[in-house]
Amino acid sequence: MTPVLPARRLLLVHAHPDDESINNGATMAKYAAEGAQVTLVTCTLGEEGEIIPPALAHLAADRDDALGPHRIGELAVAMKALGVSDHRFLGGPGRYRDSGMMGAPQNDRPECFWRAEVDDAAAHLAEVVREVRPQVLVTYDPHGGYGHPDHIQAHRVAMRAAELAAEPAYRRDLGDPHQIAKIYWNCVPRSELEEGFARLRAQGDGAPFPRIASAGDVPGVVDDARVTATVDGAGYAEAKAEAMRAHATQIAVDGPFFALSNDLGQPLSAMEHYLLVRGQAVAASGSDRGREDDLFAGVSV
């Protein structure tokens, strides 16, 4: 018997544990609370991540190489904070290893995500698409937001999986083809980011982090005019912050600000922004910028 699916279904594809909470935590919490099916697919365990707490430094790839399993636990706690129950790792936990930063020796490991054949990796995701049948997909832009090989590869795999899942002749054993109605890429409007940096600078000596990031340190920054959708997740700001705190090896959260292992402070925002690249935009009523305020706007449910 075919299970009855929720009316609204959102799929997010991310490279590493923590990417989902930083980029889309408020969006995920909002739609999950409203009864939508929210499915997260994470492509690697993030084994090559830099570790913030000194007490956990032994987990690093060049020591115990145990960061990946630890981050599985962090992600589970984050998903609970966001109210999301459907989370999967692409091809199963550990199928693809974190590739490290672009140009690192880890890029050459045969098991790393960067080295995966796109169609092979996309096959795992197409299976998920055929199963959960999302109307909306969220992932990165072609540059992966900031050029990390796993983010670039996640973009390629997500876009290819959307094509494969919609192809009637592809893997009939996976069920009927499914066309995703709307595809969005994550982005951050430059003006909002600069306003957040200004709030950080205004803290003066009381700033929670010793240094402040710049726009060049933040993935996916775009000119405001390019943003096509903004999800107001203000009611879920604490859920997002709690999810980010769960990723303690990677993120330090202090009030409305956070820093990664580079210790550069940046604003923690529950206003999350997107660029629609497939589908029809339906601007919110009264929007003076012509942006959508709902990723499902115009979608038949």
Curated annotation (Swiss-Prot):
- How does the cofactor bind to this protein, according to its record? Binds 1 zinc ion per subunit.
Q: Which UniProt keywords apply?
A: Hydrolase, Metal-binding, Zinc
The record's Pfam families line, in alphabetical order, gives:
PIG-L
- The positions annotated for binding Zn(2+) are 16, 19, 151
E.C. code:
3.5.1.103
Q: Which GO terms describe its molecular function?
A: N-acetylglucosaminylinositol deacetylase activity; zinc ion binding
- Superkingdom is Bacteria
A Gene Ontology biological process term:
mycothiol biosynthetic process
Catalytic activity from the UniProt record: 1D-myo-inositol 2-acetamido-2-deoxy-alpha-D-glucopyranoside + H2O = 1D-myo-inositol 2-amino-2-deoxy-alpha-D-glucopyranoside + acetate
Enumerate the cofactors the protein uses: Zn(2+)
Q: Does the keyword Hydrolase apply?
A: yes
Q: What does this protein do?
A: Catalyzes the deacetylation of 1D-myo-inositol 2-acetamido-2-deoxy-alpha-D-glucopyranoside (GlcNAc-Ins) in the mycothiol biosynthesis pathway.
Q: Which PANTHER family match?
A: 1D-MYO-INOSITOL 2-ACETAMIDO-2-DEOXY-ALPHA-D-GLUCOPYRANOSIDE DEACETYLASE (PTHR12993:SF26), N-ACETYLGLUCOSAMINYL-PHOSPHATIDYLINOSITOL DE-N-ACETYLASE-RELATED (PTHR12993)
Similarity-based family: Belongs to the MshB deacetylase family.
Protein name listed in UniProt: 1D-myo-inositol 2-acetamido-2-deoxy-alpha-D-glucopyranoside deacetylase
**Species for this entry:** Streptomyces bingchenggensis (strain BCW-1)
